[in-house]
Amino acid sequence: MQTKTNYRKKPPFFILVWAIPLIIFCLYAIYQHYITGLPYYGQGRIPMKQATALSVPGFSFINQEGKTIDSTTIKNKIWVADFFFTSCPSICPKMTEHLKTVQAAFNNSDDVKILSFSVDPERDNPKKLEQYAHTHSIDSNSWSLLTGSKKDLYSYARHGLFIDATDGDGGVEDFIHSDRFVLIDREGHIRGYYDGTSDMDTKLLIADIKTLL
């Protein structure tokens, strides 16, 4: 009589592909929250100690409703910044979807805001931004799409949030296209940079915001 040999089944490959990043994410979140705390960032995106941390400079731009949004609007708030343009066919739609996930995660909190700065302000006037907000179901109470002087927007990107390391003066030929999300705490310190096209980085961003709340 033949006996059947029992072989231990190996887990499907797709389960491993899904599980390993999740485990890494959980370990990272625990490490950040309970052990190290979030770092502070300065020029060149270099981590620094809290005592030497820089505060982001002030700003004043116009949102999708034609209202002025400035530093006082987000005083004592935790906020996320990114740079986009409404006609962007590549990374911007993905980044917007990820920011919608962030918005939904803190929908009931007035302590978290999102600011999306246009890098194409000549085309992205308030009306165009309002159309974009409507198309993507963006709640203006917590998420502002900003436009203004290209020179001022580009200067803030480079010298305020250190989003781009290239030189430029905000002129006609100057262009910034970044996939970064930037996390700023209540005191105006930069606490993190994230790949705005990454599902995993978006989850990390949400976890880090919860750490700051």
Listing of model-derived features with the role each one plays in the protein:
Residues 96-156:
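Structural microenvironment flanking redox-active thiols in thiol-disulfide oxidoreductases
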Residues 69-99, 115:
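Short active-site neighborhood of thiol/selenol oxidoreductases, capturing the structured segment around
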Residues 54-56, 74-78, 109-112, 124, ...:
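Extracytoplasmic
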Residues 143, 154, 158-166, 175-182:
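Structural micro-motif
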Residues 46-80:
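Short extracytoplasmic
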Residues 167-213:
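Thiol-/selenol-based redox modules, centered on thioredoxin-like
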Residues 1-58:
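N-terminal targeting signals for export/organelle localization
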